[in-house]
Amino acid sequence: MTDSPNEDVMWIMHMIMHRYRAKQFELLRDGNYDITHMEAKVLSYVGRHPGATQGELSRFMERDKAQLARLIKGLRDKSLVISEMDPDDRRSMRLTLTDAGNHIRTIMKREGKRLTELGVSGLSEEEHQQLLKLVHKVYENFE
């Protein structure tokens, strides 16, 4: 591990998410879906927030608009996302998933649920609640 217990906590949290993502994206790679981690995050967000704008997505993902514009263009080129002009603000585009984009999102959600169950298997309800409380406390420290 590392030189300090605090670093150990952050390291193990990082490694948990790294393994989770690696397992999740094995499915995408092996299933020939041809999307990147960042593209999958966009699909996930737009699926949960149909009609989201690029600005909303930018704030959520903490990425600049230029980077997201490239991601969105790639997803449009792959026919996974549709962008339509916002009738209330012609400078803004509203994003929605295509059927193909929704299909990939559904597969990712199913795989995410399976991996989540795997990750917390063996925890008692009390341990689960304690872990959730502690991780939430760490999360709040970064706000």
Pin down the residues of each PLM region.
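N-terminal leader segment of winged-helix/HTH proteins
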Residues: 1-31
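Positions in alpha-helical segments
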Residues: 7, 11, 41, 114-118
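A cross-family signal for key residues in well-ordered alpha-helices
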Residues: 14, 44, 59, 106, ...
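Short, locally clustered residues in the helix-turn-helix/winged-helix DNA-binding domain
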Residues: 17-18, 44-48, 109, 136
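Charged, amphipathic alpha-helical coiled-coil/dimerization segments
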Residues: 21-26, 73-136
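N-terminal helix-turn-helix DNA-binding core of bacterial DNA-binding proteins
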Residues: 22-67, 72
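Generic C-terminal helix-cap and adjacent flexible tail
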Residues: 140-143
